[in-house]
């Protein structure tokens, strides 16, 4: 560190030595001579003293200057280059708190002055408007005065408005000058405020005055005089009334501050375009939203109710779900009828397990042999009969008992008043017996239990009571409400007691109907007859059905051309609880559809077409939704093998039963798809459908016509006829099993343990083994195991016993084994001989 004396420091700062010594003494330093040394700390102390004496304390600078210099090279034509230097300078000044407070106070004063000026301007405008209205009223009164006074001379009325007109220009000029001065002052204040805000980097304040967009003045009628507003505006502008006028008290359009919520009404189905229209958005927006949800749609796509509700709620709208049943409601209203109710016969459904004797019991009651006419001895249709007994008329419905006819039994329970549950005394309660009990309970129908085959050895009534009590059916003998009757359909034992129990239950139910009302009923069965067309079996539930009535049945309609009873005899009318077959419908209705007599054909056609379209839309919407739901589940999976079937049956109930049974077959690899089904014979269109879709033709109690047989023979289609439902199900199961292919299974034939290893010039390492399990065969695949771990898999090349080739070596014998392409055999290894067998897979 360089030594500096007081004298040298005085020369450096260009100050006299005496003055410097005096300042050092004032700073409290001990220097008194010019030759004394001054250290750096003493210099700092002196500098601080000098700054404080000049009222400039050691603090951060209030002004900062930033300089930036950048140099770049600019190339010009040829090899010349020019250096460009850009210099930027920026100065930041920190203001004191006093200046900031003064600035804020000045801004507040200016803002308050601007607001006062604007308020004064508004008050002046209001006063001016009131004056103008008063002046306009006075002018109008003066103009109307001459017309009102017919008697006096015109000259006498003229001087009256003169004072007002004379004073008008003076007051108008004064008001205009005052308003102009206030307007200029307000404009200067606003300009000054905006300049200050711009200097501070703030957003300009918005004046409380609402600026209104100038618009063209509407042309005035030719006969109207110049208004006072125009005169005053012209005077204020000083342009003689020329130019555009400002409209006062006009509000411009304001954007909505929040989202607009619409009330969206959604029926069972709705298209994308209709949904967008109700939400007041473009259809493309809805399509885009659904694409984001992972659902590709078009504007004409039909959406189901749940999907449309989800979209509308996600977009923030209120949803109201409605049912498109206005037409149905009007139809129901028109079918109401008031009349005298009378008692009617009970409708009794006979239910129970297959082969428990339901049809045989009915045969005895009807004195007819129905069971003998059914294929395979089992009932495959719903039979409807009405029987006149000594105690009154009873209508019976005979339902199938096989597992495939669950839907038929459910329909039978829904259309009935009483259920006779037939249970074989020697067989007990079976699965379909339990199902019949469940159907009866679901429909709220009372039960009468008929314990059949009571004459057979091994009949145990107490066992039946025990098993049914588990299902919730308790006999009257045990304190319940269900009568148990012992019967024998073969011998006729107990049939009278059974009918008495049924009629007793009917009296308790007090069954009534109105015979004078239009007929109403339910479809028990339907089929397509080759000569007569669609034939439907109807159970009339209320009113009277007559020949010639126009009927609506589900999505079908038509006029009743003919009516037949269960024996095939024509009848003219059918009352309550009477089953009949009707002809004249335009198609085969679904079993379970309700039939109603309507007033005219127009109404029937309208409702039928509405139901058809509604069913089609709902079906398409659900199919599309299901397809979209499964698109990600099936992605990456192998496609299922499908057995396509075209199925034709004699009646609609059998078609439903077969479709339900066949649809339940299959697994994750194979499935059954009924691509075409209908009632009636096999036609050319069915054969062409089977040809186009590579399907199998099944006919249940129907046959193919000549055209269909020709196509089947030419194209080699597979067509099969059946009359028992078991056979169809078994054949389809076999076909699906064949489509599954086979599995490869490994069978271990034998195991040999290596006792020693020899070397052979021909085969290499030869393992001397003892067969410890099974039999070892030559030319079979083997595995080499070491410590129970597979280390090699190959083929057995050489097998010898006592130097002779052997085809096989049994357990407990020694042999030499040569493993093909493997020489690393060690003592203690095990050689496992196996074979691969293909095994057929099952469902």
UniProtKB/Swiss-Prot annotation:
Region (G2): 377-381
G3 as annotated region, ranges: 398-401
Biased composition (Basic residues): 237-250
Basic and acidic residues bias spans: 96-135, 174-203, 227-236
InterPro entries (alphabetical): DNA-bd_dom_put_sf, EF-G-like_DII, IF2_assoc_dom_bac, IF2_II, IF2_N, P-loop_NTPase, Small_GTP-bd, T_Tr_GTP-bd_dom
Protein name: Translation initiation factor IF-2
Single Gene Ontology MF annotation: GTPase activity
Species of the source: Pseudomonas putida (strain W619)
Family classification: Belongs to the TRAFAC class translation factor GTPase superfamily. Classic translation factor GTPase family. IF-2 subfamily.
């Amino acid at each position: 560190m360089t030594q500096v004396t007081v004298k040298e420091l005085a020369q450096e700062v260009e100050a006299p030595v005496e003055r410097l010594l005096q300042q050092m003494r004032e700073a409290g330093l001990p220097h008194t001579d010019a030759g004394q040394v001054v250290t750096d700390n003493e210099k700092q102390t002196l500098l601080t003293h000098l700054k404080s004496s000049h009222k400039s304390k050691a603090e951060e600078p209030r002004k900062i200057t930033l300089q930036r210099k950048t140099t770049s090279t600019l190339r010009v034509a040829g090899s010349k280059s020019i250096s460009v230097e850009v210099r930027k300078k920026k100065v930041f000044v920190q203001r004191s708190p006093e200046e900031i407070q003064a600035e804020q106070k000045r801004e507040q004063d200016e803002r308050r002055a601007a607001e006062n000026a604007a308020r004064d301007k508004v008050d002046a405008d209001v006063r001016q408007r009131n004056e103008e209205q008063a002046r306009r009223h006075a002018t109008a009164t003066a103009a109307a005065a001459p017309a009102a006074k017919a008697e006096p001379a015109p000259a006498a009325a003229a001087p009256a408005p003169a004072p007002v007109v004379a004073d008008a220009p003076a007051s108008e000029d004064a008001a205009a000058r005052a308003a102009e001065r206030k307007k200029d002052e307000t404009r200067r204040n606003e300009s000054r405020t905006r300049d200050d805000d711009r200097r501070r980097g703030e957003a300009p304040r918005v004046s409380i005055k609402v600026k209104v967009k100038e618009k063209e003045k509407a042309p005035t009628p030719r006969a109207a005089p110049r208004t006072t507003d125009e005169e005053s505006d012209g005077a204020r502008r000083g342009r003689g009334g020329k130019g555009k006028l400002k409209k006062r008290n006009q509000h411009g359009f304001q954007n909505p501050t929040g989202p607009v919520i619409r009330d969206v009404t959604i029926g069972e189905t709705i298209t994308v375009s209709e949904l967008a229209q109700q939400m007041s958005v473009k259809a493309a927006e809805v399509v885009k939203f659904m694409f984001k949800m992972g659902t590709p749609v078009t504007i004409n796509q039909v959406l189901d109710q749940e999907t449309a509700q989800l979209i509308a709620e996600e977009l923030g709208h209120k949803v109201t779900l409605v049912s498109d049943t206005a037409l149905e409601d009007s139809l129901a209203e028109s079918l109401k009828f008031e009349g005298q109710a009378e008692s009617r016969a009970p409708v009794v459904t006979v239910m129970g397990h297959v082969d428990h004797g339901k049809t045989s019991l009915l045969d005895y009651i009807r004195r007819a042999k129905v069971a003998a006419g059914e294929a395979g001895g089992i009932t495959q249709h719903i039979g409807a009969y009405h029987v006149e007994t000594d105690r009154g008329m009873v209508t019976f419905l005979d339902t199938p008992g096989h597992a495939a006819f669950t839907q038929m039994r459910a329909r039978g329970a829904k259309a009935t008043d009483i259920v006779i549950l037939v249970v074989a005394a020697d067989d007990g309660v079976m699965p379909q017996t339990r199902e019949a009990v469940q159907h009866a309970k679901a429909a709220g129908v009372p039960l009468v239990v008929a314990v059949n085959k009571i004459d057979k050895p091994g009949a145990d009534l107490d066992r039946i009571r025990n098993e049914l009590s588990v299902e919730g059916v308790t006999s009257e003998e045990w304190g319940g409400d269900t009568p148990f009757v012992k019967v024998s359909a073969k011998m006729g034992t107990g049939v009278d007691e059974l009918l008495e129990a049924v009629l007793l239950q009917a009296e308790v139910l007090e069954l009534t109907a109105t015979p004078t009302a239009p007929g109403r009923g339910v479809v028990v069965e339907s089929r397509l007859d080759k000569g007569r067309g669609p034939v439907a079996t109807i159970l009339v539930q209320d009113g009277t059905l007559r020949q010639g009535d126009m009927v609506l049945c589900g999505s079908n309609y038509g006029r009743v051309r003919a009516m037949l009873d269960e024996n095939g005899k024509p009848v003219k009318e059918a009352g309550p609880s009477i089953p009949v077959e009707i002809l004249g419908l335009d198609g085969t209705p679904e079993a379970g559809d309700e039939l109603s007599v309507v007033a005219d054909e127009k109404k029937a056609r309208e409702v039928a077409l509405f139901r058809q379209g509604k069913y089609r839309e709902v079906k398409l919407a659900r199919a599309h939704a299901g397809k979209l739901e499964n698109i990600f589940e099936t992605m990456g999976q192998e496609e299922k093998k499908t057995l396509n079937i075209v199925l034709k049956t004699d009646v609609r109930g059998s078609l439903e039963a077969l479709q339900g049974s066949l649809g339940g077959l299959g697994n994750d690899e194979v499935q059954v798809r009924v691509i075409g089904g209908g009632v009636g014979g096999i036609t050319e269109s069915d054969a062409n459908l089977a040809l186009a879709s590579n399907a199998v033709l099944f006919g249940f109690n129907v046959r193919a016509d000549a055209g269909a047989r020709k196509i089947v023979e030419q194209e080699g289609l597979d067509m099969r006829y059946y009359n028992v439902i078991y056979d169809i199900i078994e054949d389809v199961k076999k076909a699906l099993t064949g489509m599954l292919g086979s599995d490869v299974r490994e069978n271990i034939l034998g195991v040999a343990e290596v006792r020693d290893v020899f070397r052979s010039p021909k085969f290499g390492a030869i393992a001397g083994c003892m067969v410890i399990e099974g039999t070892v065969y030559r030319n079979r695949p083997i595995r080499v195991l070491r410590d129970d771990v597979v280390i090699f898999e190959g083929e057995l090349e050489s097998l010898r016993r006592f130097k002779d080739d052997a085809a096989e070596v049994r357990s407990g014998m020694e042999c030499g084994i040569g493993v093909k392409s493997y020489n690393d055999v060690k003592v203690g290894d095990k050689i496992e001989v196996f074979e691969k067998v293909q095994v057929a897979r099952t469902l």
